[in-house]
């Protein structure tokens, strides 16, 4: 993900990897309906997205002369490279190697456990005031220096999940979970993200959606409900014709009857 060899040892393949306009706007100019104001998620934005003028002492061998994105060296063409997981060279941190930052690959973060609890507590409702859910939700926000909330809406949860886990490959699964009960809502959301948009003006170092942008964006197909599920493989349908959907795309289901052939709780681990 590193955008130059000044911030990674020898190899830097992230020069053309940028934060999308939609995510950048959500980090820096989010309309928080619960708080009733526009908010800038400064801490997580700073550590997730490198934008012009952001100072990173941790990327320099001399913290008094920090690496400043776009100043120490030119910013990329989109001016918003991915900062998360970019931790500098071995001279800076003492352990990075070419093609190996030394960062652990997290299988499950505590913040994910907390937000999954909030999701479960909310269920199919659009908000929750469950005390434990609020405790966990606000614990995640406190770490990011964001104000606490006394009610969590689904939009709050979606936003928090996206901010906390940006570039970690988890956000899509949060949307899929929502689509189980609010399919069209998710499809509409996916089709209103200003995809493939240019938004950095290098001459002024400003960030705004290009005047020439038209939705849904260049080389972007509109999402449909079919994009939210993986089809059952042809090989599996051939082996079991009952898995073949009908003309409406539905698969016949029957209730499973538990009987003597199942192992009971007492013998499960014998």
How would you label these PLM feature ranges?
Residues 1-30, 194, 203:
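Polar, glycine-rich mid-to-C-terminal structural blocks
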Residues 35-270:
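Acidic/polar-rich alpha-helix caps and helix-coil junctions
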